[in-house]
Amino acid sequence: INIDNCKTIPFWFFQYKNILHELCSKHFDYICSYLIYHDCGKPFCLIIDDNGKRHFPNHAIISKNTFLQYSSNQFIANLIEKDMLCHITKPKDYLSLVYEPYIELLLCSALAELHSNASMFGGFASDSFKIKFKNLDKLGQRILDAKYNKNNSQGI
């Protein structure tokens, strides 16, 4: 793969591909269920503001609780609950996620969701997508360097 042609795939995805592949392969069935059900609580928390914009306050927790009404799989429920961590954590606050269980899965999921929802942000060329991608790129690089690269530049 020519990394230069992959402008919307962060470098960390290639740099840590063996670790990511091993972890994702090990939990493949659970990841599939997590990705299918991670927003299952959204219908129960939808709020439409005065401008017609849709909001889903606390949707990750509500989705976890909704999922647990139909499944006892706590592993998937925990991934659902933490689904927004990589979307809302600023790169400067990466240390709070370094030892988060299965942070690698959450980073990959956030990347997949960002690509899946690109049109909602105005497309891959939009400023909105670029900002979200840049934040996820920095966050993922800092987390994975801190966790796996003993000679990283983050000072950990």
Place the predicted regions along the sequence by residue.
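Divalent metal-dependent catalytic cores for phosphoryl transfer on phosphate-bearing substrates
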Residues: 11-122
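Charged substrate- and nucleic-acid-binding regions of tRNA-handling and nucleotidyl-transfer enzymes
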Residues: 103-110, 114-156
